[in-house]
Amino acid sequence: MKALQTLMSGESLTQDQTREFFQRLIKGELNDIQVSAALIAMKMRGETPAELAGAAEAILSAAKPFLRSDTTVIDSCGTGGDGSNTINISTTAALVAASMGLAVAKHGNRSVSSRSGSADVLEALKLRVNLDPSDASTQLADNGFCFLFAPHYHPGIKHAMPVRQTLKTRTLFNLIGPLVNPARPDAQLLGVYSEEWVRPMAETLQRLGVKRAMVVHGSGLDELALHGPTRVIELRNGELNDYHVTPNDFGVPSAPLDELKGGDADFNARILEDILAGGGSPAQRHSVAMNVAALLYLSGQYNDMKAATAATMEHLDTGQPLLHLRRVQDAQETYHV
């Protein structure tokens, strides 16, 4: 196989070559040795934006179809794997943003390195994570929020699971999740587990034609950080802008990372509901508000992060986000089982 020969010689694949290789992988046409060799060859050299984009195109082309309206759809998603075991910041931010009128199609999975991934905490909130695509589409249209469970939409990925479980090391698949949202969001807040991936992931989104995005790494977190500076590469109108932000840019004080410490899914779900009800600690509220502000900014509703954060804090005080979550919970009772 030419693609494998190219990789084994230390060269990178083109976007087209990678797409063709992963199309074969998700059809089950490659054996475990071929899959393992390719993943390790790319990992040792470092996956390129062309390879990430090609793999994402292959996976998206085979995904279960998801019908969405012409409204601007946004996603708040991280790679996971930062090892911080914080509360579910991006999931909480997604629900708050939906209650403020954004259409958030959150793509996610179970835990990577923490005790509670996005799917885990949503299940603890009694939300069904494996909705039929038509029901998820209805949920997004009616309530501005839906969760798209990655294994449900990308069944072909199972062909790589034996290799991934055997290798027990990060590969391209640890980066690809935020790139293969079947709703094909117009804008994304994408967190990465290591700063080395900020630019490659931003360039990958650029290749995939995403309209607006912020790729972030916040002092060890795959989120905007409250405890230190956050590296950002912003994608807008096809151009990339590289900068750093601090909590001060959002008008909130810094706080130690341990003030965002999470637990298991039930523990994190209780904190999430507390924040949505207008409670939570100052650090929890500020962290969520910063991430919501970025979503409001990416959606075009605000051009100023401080104003967007202040608006989010005021909205949290009303308790409306929790009422919105209750509507999402109630609506799913009318969907297919």
From Swiss-Prot:
Mg(2+) 1 binds at residues 90, 223. Anthranilate 1 binds at residues 78, 109. Signal peptide: none annotated. Keywords: Amino-acid biosynthesis, Aromatic amino acid biosynthesis, Glycosyltransferase, Magnesium, Metal-binding, Transferase, Tryptophan biosynthesis. Binds 2 magnesium ions per monomer. GO terms for molecular function: anthranilate phosphoribosyltransferase activity; magnesium ion binding. The keyword Iron-sulfur does not apply. Anthranilate 2 binds at residue 164. GO terms for biological process: L-tryptophan biosynthetic process. Pfam families: Glycos_trans_3N, Glycos_transf_3. Disulfide bonds: none annotated. Mg(2+) 2 binds at residues 222-223. It catalyses: N-(5-phospho-beta-D-ribosyl)anthranilate + diphosphate = 5-phospho-alpha-D-ribose 1-diphosphate + anthranilate. The keyword Magnesium applies. It comes from the Bacteria. Pathway: Amino-acid biosynthesis; L-tryptophan biosynthesis; L-tryptophan from chorismate: step 2/5. 5-phospho-alpha-D-ribose 1-diphosphate binds at residues 78, 81-82, 86, 88-91, 106-114, 118. InterPro entries: Anthranilate_Pribosyl_Tfrase, Glycosyl_Trfase_fam3, Glycosyl_Trfase_fam3_N_dom, Glycosyl_Trfase_fam3_N_dom_sf, Nuc_phospho_transferase. Its cofactor is Mg(2+). Its EC number is 2.4.2.18. GO terms for cellular component: cytosol. Homodimer. PANTHER family: ANTHRANILATE PHOSPHORIBOSYLTRANSFERASE. Catalyzes the transfer of the phosphoribosyl group of 5-phosphorylribose-1-pyrophosphate (PRPP) to anthranilate to yield N-(5'-phosphoribosyl)-anthranilate (PRA). Belongs to the anthranilate phosphoribosyltransferase family. This is Anthranilate phosphoribosyltransferase. It comes from Idiomarina loihiensis (strain ATCC BAA-735 / DSM 15497 / L2-TR). The gene is trpD.
